[in-house]
A protein has these predicted regions:
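Extracytoplasmic
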Residues: 1-130, 167-186
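Solvent-exposed, flexible loop/coil segments flanking beta-strands in beta-rich domains
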Residues: 124-177
Length: 186
């Protein structure tokens, strides 16, 4: 059993260059592969809900976002790129970046890439906010199955374009959400 555990952990051993950057700094793992902690004896400082796929409510997302926006946040984040479904797929075929949008905004706002290899991206906390304050560039009521012209966002490197939607559900969709799960939106 000990040998089997050691063999499984060896797959998540980090290369020398990554370990030189990490040293004994605090680190969190995103989105969920905590095996890196045990395999490399890292100084783990996890967010409150430490596996992104279980951050399924706005409340839990806000807990993680507040953590990354605080002095309690780790010095580094190891963002694993190779997991089931590819780089941007979460469980159940969900889009990873939709799992916790508030948390993701805080990661992008406070962390910048310092090292990358085919398996992961290592990000270091910046001393200042990296993104400009959000502004509304377009709002309105739009129809399904119709193209929407997206504003050009190439004027600055510290801007990202985000969309906030409010989808009105039919009575049957509300019932399905209550009894089973949300309907798919693409």
């Amino acid at each position: 059993m000990k040998k089997r555990s050691k063999d499984l952990l060896s797959v998540k051993k980090l290369d020398h260059e990554a370990m030189e950057i990490i040293q004994d700094n605090t680190i969190d793992i995103y989105p969920w592969e905590t095996t890196y902690i045990a395999a490399n004896n890292l100084n783990w400082k996890p967010r409150p809900v430490f596996q992104s796929y279980i951050t399924y409510t706005p409340y839990l997302d806000m807990k993680n976002a507040n953590f990354y926006n605080s002095v309690k946040s780790p010095s580094l984040i190891l963002w694993e790129k190779k997991h089931w479904g590819g780089e941007v797929e979460s469980i159940d075929g969900r889009y990873l970046l939709n799992d916790e949008p508030l948390t993701l905004f805080q990661i992008l706002n406070h962390y910048r890439p310092v090292y990358e290899n085919p398996s992961f991206l290592l990000m270091r906390r910046a001393d200042y906010e990296l993104l400009s304050q959000p502004t509304i560039v377009l709002q309105g009521v739009y129809q399904w199955n119709a193209w929407l012209n997206v504003p050009n966002n190439r004027t600055s490197t510290n801007h990202i374009l985000r969309a906030k939607t409010n989808i009105k559900r039919t009575s049957s969709q509300k019932l399905k959400k209550l009894l089973y799960k949300e309907f798919e939106v693409y």
